[in-house]
């Protein structure tokens, strides 16, 4: 029993759990369990009453709802580190911002360079710009204490800025219409959160109440609802009026739910991709090459190059006691686009099978390449 407890509480166990549920999902989707798996996550669940109802399939409740809690945790951790921790210095926090810019611009340019002659294919230019923060964090968890905290923070920070960029891209290029009323309600909720923070109110129930309304409004607005989690995190006070730690306590309470329940469930719901109808030959189509080269090469080169230039221009600084070799390994992991890339792919091509699933296969190949190469590289390089 003591051994099991030690294993569960180890730093690597959440990563192992995430990888296990990823492969379990792939197994279910590509076996006789495929129909049961699909029906389970596509089953509709309705919450509300009369005219105030939200009806969504289980996988969307997970992707739009539970993952917002994950983003809340990431936002809280980032806020704490910026105000009290290792990112207090403006040059330290600017590093992941430059990295995120490079990690979006370079893959997009690679995809465009390969697919510029094909109008429909060009709709997917944003597919390789995304980083799946959940899976990238999962790989880091597998590495345990081999990765310094400063590098973990860099990846978390970069992934948040990257996902904020993805949300902006989705809102500008892949949203059919935005609801003005829902956006106004979002602004009212943000104002309410601002007041709660200004008066240093630390009743968690009030933040939950306003947060739920904000999430619903965000859901109805056309903007990705996970942004609500990041917004809420900005307004959670660092301390109580008596100067006792508050934000850190909230984070400590949420963290076990995220790493042991939300992330494994997210992996199980999203990693189920049917690869039986995919042809390996399609990997060499322009769309596939654009995605694979964009995610696997474009991401790591873009993040590293932009960060390197920013450091040399003294606009940012490398974390203390970190060498460029180890830093590059983290850059490789940013190429894990997986579920975020699949999400943008669905928006771009409207879930069309015109490419015979070559686009989805390319996302899988690039993401697994980034994960495996990044993991091995970080294991070897000191």
From Swiss-Prot:
Question: Tell me, what is an example of a GO biological process annotation in this record?
Answer: regulation of pH
Keyword line: Antiport, Cell inner membrane, Cell membrane, Ion transport, Membrane, Sodium, Sodium transport, Transmembrane, Transmembrane helix, Transport
Membrane spanning segments where?
Answer: 7-27, 58-78, 94-114, 124-144, 153-173, 178-198, 199-219, 255-275, 291-311, 327-347, 361-381
GO molecular function terms attached to this record: sodium:proton antiporter activity
Gene3D superfamilies noted in UniProt: Na+/H+ antiporter like domain (1.20.1530.10)
A GO CC term assigned to this protein in UniProt: plasma membrane
Organism domain of life: Bacteria
- Pfam families cross-referenced by the UniProt entry: Na_H_antiport_1 (PF06965)
Per the record, membrane topology reads: Multi-pass membrane protein
Tell me where it resides: Cell inner membrane
Against InterPro entries, the record matches this protein to: Na/H_antiporter_dom_sf, NhaA
Reaction catalysed by this chain?
Na(+)(in) + 2 H(+)(out) = Na(+)(out) + 2 H(+)(in)
NCBIfam families the record matches: NhaA (TIGR00773), PRK09560.1 (NF007111), PRK09561.1 (NF007112)
**Family of the protein in this entry:** Belongs to the NhaA Na(+)/H(+) (TC 2.A.33) antiporter family.
User: Which function does this protein serve?
Assistant: Na(+)/H(+) antiporter that extrudes sodium in exchange for external protons.
From the Swiss-Prot or TrEMBL record, give the protein name. Na(+)/H(+) antiporter NhaA 2
Organism of this sequence:
Campylobacter jejuni (strain RM1221)
Q: Which gene encodes it?
A: nhaA2
């Amino acid at each position: 029993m003591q051994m099991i407890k030690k294993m569960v509480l180890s730093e690597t166990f959440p990563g192992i759990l995430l990888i296990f549920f990823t492969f379990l999902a792939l197994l279910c989707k590509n076996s006789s369990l495929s129909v049961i798996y699909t029906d389970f996550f596509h089953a509709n669940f309705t919450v509300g009453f009369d005219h105030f109802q939200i009806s969504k399939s289980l996988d969307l409740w997970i992707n739009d709802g539970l993952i917002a809690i994950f983003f809340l945790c990431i936002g809280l951790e980032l806020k704490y580190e910026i105000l009290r921790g290792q990112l207090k210095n403006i040059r330290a926090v600017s590093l992941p911002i430059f990295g995120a810019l490079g990690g979006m611009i370079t893959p997009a340019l690679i995809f465009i360079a390969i697919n510029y002659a094909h109008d429909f294919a060009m709709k997917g230019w944003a597919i390789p710009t995304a980083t799946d923060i959940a899976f990238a964090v999962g790989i880091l968890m597998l590495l345990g204490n081999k990765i310094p905290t400063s590098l973990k923070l860099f990846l978390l920070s970069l992934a948040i800025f990257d996902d904020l960029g993805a949300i902006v891209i989705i809102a500008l290029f892949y949203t059919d219409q935005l609801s003005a009323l829902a956006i106004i309600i979002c602004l009212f909720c943000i104002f309410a959160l601002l007041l709660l923070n200004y008066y240093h109110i630390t009743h968690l129930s009030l933040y939950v109440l306003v947060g739920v309304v904000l999430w619903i409004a965000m859901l109805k607005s056309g903007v990705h609802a996970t942004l609500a989690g990041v917004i809420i995190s900005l307004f959670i006070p660092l301390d109580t009026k008596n100067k006792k730690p508050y934000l850190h306590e909230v984070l400590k309470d949420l963290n076990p739910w995220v790493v042991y329940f939300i992330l494994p469930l997210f992996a199980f719901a999203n990693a189920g991709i049917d690869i039986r109808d995919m042809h390996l030959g399609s990997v060499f189509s322009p769309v596939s090459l654009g995605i694979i080269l964009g995610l696997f090469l474009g991401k790591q080169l873009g993040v590293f190059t932009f960060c390197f230039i920013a450091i040399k221009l003294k606009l940012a600084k490398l974390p203390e006691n970190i060498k460029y070799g180890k830093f590059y390994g983290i850059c490789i992991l940013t190429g894990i686009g997986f579920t975020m890339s699949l999400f943008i792919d669905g928006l771009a091509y409207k879930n069309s099978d015109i490419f015979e699933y070559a686009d989805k296969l390319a996302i899988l190949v690039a993401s697994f390449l980034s994960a495996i190469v990044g993991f091995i590289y970080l294991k070897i390089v000191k």
